[in-house]
Regions:
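Short amphipathic alpha-helix segments
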Residues: 10-28
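Conserved, structured core segments of small domains
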Residues: 19-20, 32-37, 72-74, 79
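Short connector loops at helix/strand junctions that flank enzyme active sites
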Residues: 1, 42-44, 66
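C-terminal structural segments of small proteins and small subunits
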Residues: 50-81
Length: 81
């Protein structure tokens, strides 16, 4: 299964998105500390989601006006959004 990480600066924001994804779209995700392979200037939390749900999840983040540090592939940790 292909995974990706949507990175947020706070646990609260990640948790809000996780709840909205499950409630509004039935999409399950996992909150975790951002892997060290993703080089960011500060610590952060991310949602690990199936890549198949990325468009739905990203649209929800944008429409909600929430701030994200980006989306990274779980394979290679490349920034994809």
């Amino acid at each position: 299964m292909n995974w990706c990480f949507i990175v947020f600066s706070s646990f609260a924001t990640a948790n809000r998105v996780k709840s909205l994804l499950l409630k509004n779209h039935g999409i399950k995700s996992t909150i975790m500390q951002t892997p060290g392979e993703i080089k960011l200037k500060s610590c952060s939390y991310c949602l690990k989601i199936n890549l198949l749900h990325l468009d739905t999840a990203w649209d929800m983040v944008v429409r909600s006006g929430l701030s994200s540090k980006g989306v990274f592939s779980a394979e290679g940790f490349n920034k994809i959004r």
